[in-house]
């Protein structure tokens, strides 16, 4: 028990400085955005769906792998847990209690996310151009890159037309797939504190609370741009 407590304390102390790092802003966020991206929840996991063109320009191997597609879904997580054909208790404990290698899971999305992931929870986020660029930078920096700046392909992905890539940073108790999503939101200018955003519920609840605050006429999060439930189109 003392060992586990020590691990938790150390995790709390190091979580804010763990890769992938939040992209910090030097300007105030815009109130309205035109760049449409999606936050997707699959069970206990969350990730982003973004238009493919710009991220493929930044990471040409994505274009080589997926070709001319409208969107790509990105998720970050534990290498062993994410790629496992069978989830065991030992694998779960290892992923949670001990820093492990990470992967990026990239999925070709041929239509809008709310249609493609009809059985998942999907939210739409409207970003300004600067906020969108910052989110794409965060996603790009979530990939491990070799000395030539190339991303490294691993195994095929787990659903659809998908691929695993070697990730940047380690997965552990206080640096989970959902905290990665929170870091992405923070990088995009959303006023969210990633520290304890460790579960899918904590991410999606934040989105719902923010939407409710918008409905009441006061966001309570002055640095955030509008979120809506899909389907929704940014203006």
Tell what function each PLM region has.
Residues 2-9:
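Sec-dependent signal peptide recognition
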Residues 9-10, 227:
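Residue-level signal for mature regions of secreted extracellular proteins and peptides
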Residues 12-15:
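C-terminal motif of bacterial Sec signal peptides marking the signal peptidase cleavage site
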Residues 17-18, 141-235:
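Activation targets extended, charge/polar-rich intrinsically disordered C-terminal tails
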Residues 22-36, 40-43, 51-166, 234:
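Non-catalytic ligand/cofactor/substrate-binding and regulatory segments of enzyme domains
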């Amino acid at each position: 028990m003392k060992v586990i407590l020590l691990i938790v304390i150390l995790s709390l102390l190091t979580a804010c400085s763990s890769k992938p790092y939040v992209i910090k802003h030097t300007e105030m966020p815009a109130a309205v955005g035109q760049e449409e991206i999606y936050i997707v929840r699959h069970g206990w996991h969350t990730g982003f769906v973004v238009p493919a063109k710009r991220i493929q320009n930044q990471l040409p191997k994505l274009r080589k792998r997926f070709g001319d597609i409208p969107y790509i879904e990105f998720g970050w997580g534990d290498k062993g847990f994410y790629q496992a054909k069978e989830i065991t208790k030992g694998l779960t404990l290892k992923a949670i209690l001990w820093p492990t290698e990470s992967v990026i899971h990239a999925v070709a999305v041929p239509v809008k996310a709310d249609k493609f992931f009809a059985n998942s929870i999907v939210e739409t986020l409207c970003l300004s151009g600067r906020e969108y660029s910052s989110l794409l930078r965060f996603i790009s920096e979530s990939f491990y890159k070799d000395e030539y700046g190339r991303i490294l392909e691993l195994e095929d992905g787990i659903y659809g037309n998908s691929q695993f890539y070697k990730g940047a940073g380690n997965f552990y108790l206080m640096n989970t797939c959902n905290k990665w999503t929170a870091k992405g939101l923070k990088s995009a200018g959303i006023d969210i504190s990633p520290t304890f955003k460790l579960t899918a519920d904590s991410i999606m609840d934040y989105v719902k609370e923010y939407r409710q605050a918008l409905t009441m006429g006061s966001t309570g999060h002055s640095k955030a741009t509008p979120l809506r439930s899909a389907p929704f189109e940014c203006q």
